[in-house]
C-alpha cells in the first residue's frame, strides 16, 4: 500500500510518501495550493491520503476524492492521538 501522509499548514504542507511493502519513505515540502496538490495526486500512485482535521483538510479531502483516492482525516484532539505517560 502506498500512503501519502499530509501535515497541513496554512501556506505549506509536508508530504510523506510511504510504501508499506518496501518500507521506503520520502518527504516533500509543498505549497498548500489546490493546483499543486491536484498535480501531486495525478503524478503519484497513492492508495490512501492521511491528514489531520484542520482548515484546509475539507477541500483537500474533496480533491483527493475527485481523484478516486481513499482518505483518512484524523482529529488530533481525540484520545487516539494522545500519548499517555
Predicted regions and their residues:
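Phosphate- and other anionic-substrate recognition elements at nucleic-acid/protein interfaces
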Residues: 1-85
Amino acid at each position: 500500500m502506498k500512503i501519502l501522509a499530509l501535515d497541513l499548514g496554512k501556506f505549506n504542507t509536508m508530504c510523506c510518501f510511504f510504501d508499506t511493502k518496501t518500507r521506503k519513505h520520502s518527504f516533500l515540502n509543498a505549497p498548500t495550493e489546490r493546483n499543486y496538490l491536484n498535480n501531486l495526486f495525478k503524478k503519484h500512485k497513492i492508495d490512501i491520503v492521511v491528514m489531520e482535521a484542520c482548515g484546509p483538510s475539507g477541500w483537500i479531502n474533496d480533491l483527493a476524492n475527485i481523484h478516486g483516492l481513499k482518505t483518512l482525516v484524523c482529529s488530533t484532539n481525540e484520545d487516539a492521538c494522545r500519548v499517555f505517560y
